[in-house]
Structures are given as structure tokens and as C-alpha cells.
Swiss-Prot record:
PANTHER family (alphabetical): PROTEIN PBDC1
Organism: Mus musculus (Mouse)
UniProt keyword annotations, A-Z: Phosphoprotein
A Pfam cross-reference name: PBDC1
Start-end of Basic and acidic residues biased regions: 171-198
Gene: Pbdc1
The protein, known as: Protein PBDC1
Length: 198
């Protein structure tokens, strides 16, 4: 038991250390690989939870923050022509785009918790989180784009796609079960008919 207790202590100490490190603003750190990894893990966990959420319900009715209406109206006021179904990274990361995004993001400082935390954002909303389909963005940028995708119906493709896959898998299993049941049930049924006829 002592050996197990010793191995658990560094893990819990490490977890506390990571939690403590993540509580500081990212600007206060250099390029510490451990910190970068902790941020990447947290961003990936957020992405996984969000993708499961939009896969399991109709995203059009999701509420991501208490101020979704404000985020959406201000986003569409400033970025009225921005395509949100398939994003162009230049419209998020170029110098001219950053000049336009910066004031928008700063409007939500103190309103949206962790508004500037790094978050993974899908470029093509009809696809999942893959290395090729993901860009790192501030959380408020993620919220603005994903709220627009949800309200404008673009994320529905994800839930429909997942439900179609589940339906195909379920139908395949039902057909297989029906074939097995028909084989065994058919023999029993024939036997019952013979007995009933005799």
C-alpha cells in the first residue's frame, strides 16, 4: 500500500500543479512545453465535449453561454458576410482579420468567462476535429462562430450524419438479428405447424 500511496502523491501533485498553472493568464508564460501541453489537453477535452453535444441533439436549440443572443447579434453586425460553414483561416488569422476581431473579442472581456482562452475550432463544420480541419482560436471567436453555425443550421449536418451512421449500424444489426431469428424461428414454426397438423 505504501508503494501505491507514493505513486499517487506525485500524480495528484502534478494535477494540482497543472490546475494551478492553468489558472494564470497565458500571457504570463513563455513557451514552456509542459504548459503548452496542458493547454492543448484542455482545448482537446473542450472540443470533444462540444462535438458530442452537437452530435447528440439538434444544435439549433443549443445555448452555449448566457449571452448567446448578444454574441450572435454583435458577431453578425461586424462579420455579416463571413461564411461560417467553411472557414478561411485568413479571415481569422491575417493581420487585417486580427484588427477586426480584436475589438469584437475585447467587448466580451468580463462578460464571457475565459473569453481569450485558446480553443479548437473546426474549419469545415460538416466534419469533426482532425488535425487538418482544426485551428486554434480564442474562446469568444469559437463561441461567435459556433453560435452562428448552430442558429443558421450548419451544425445540423453533424447530428444528422451521426444519427444516420447510428441508424445504419442499428439497421445492420436488426437485419442480422432478423435473419438469425428467421432461421431459428422458421424451423420452430415449421415444427409447430407439423405438430398442430398431426
Amino acid at each position: 500500500m505504501d508503494a501505491a500511496g507514493e505513486s499517487e502523491e506525485p500524480v495528484s501533485g502534478e494535477a494540482l500543479s497543472i490546475a494551478h498553472a492553468l489558472s494564470h493568464p497565458p500571457e504570463s508564460y513563455g513557451n514552456d512545453p509542459d504548459i503548452e501541453m496542458a493547454w492543448a489537453i484542455r482545448a482537446m477535452q473542450h472540443a470533444e465535449v462540444y462535438y458530442k453535444l452537437i452530435s447528440s441533439v439538434d444544435p439549433q436549440f443549443l445555448k452555449l453561454t448566457k449571452v448567446d443572443d448578444q454574441i450572435y447579434s454583435e458577431f453578425r453586425e461586424i462579420f455579416e458576410t463571413l461564411r461560417v460553414d467553411v472557414l478561411d483561416p485568413e479571415e481569422l488569422k491575417s493581420e487585417s482579420a486580427k484588427e477586426k476581431w480584436r475589438p469584437f473579442c475585447l467587448k466580451f472581456e468580463g462578460i464571457v468567462e475565459d473569453y481569450n482562452y485558446g480553443t479548437l475550432l473546426r474549419l469545415d463544420c460538416s466534419q469533426g476535429y482532425t488535425e487538418e480541419n482544426t485551428i486554434f482560436a480564442p474562446r469568444i471567436q469559437f463561441f461567435a462562430i459556433e453560435i452562428a453555425r448552430n442558429r443558421e443550421g450548419y451544425n445540423k449536418a453533424v447530428s444528422v450524419s451521426i444519427q444516420d451512421k447510428e441508424g445504419e449500424e442499428g439497421a445492420g444489426n436488426k437485419e442480422e438479428a432478423a435473419e438469425k431469428g428467421a432461421d431459428s424461428g422458421g424451423e420452430k414454426e415449421e415444427g409447430a405447424n407439423r405438430e398442430g397438423e398431426k
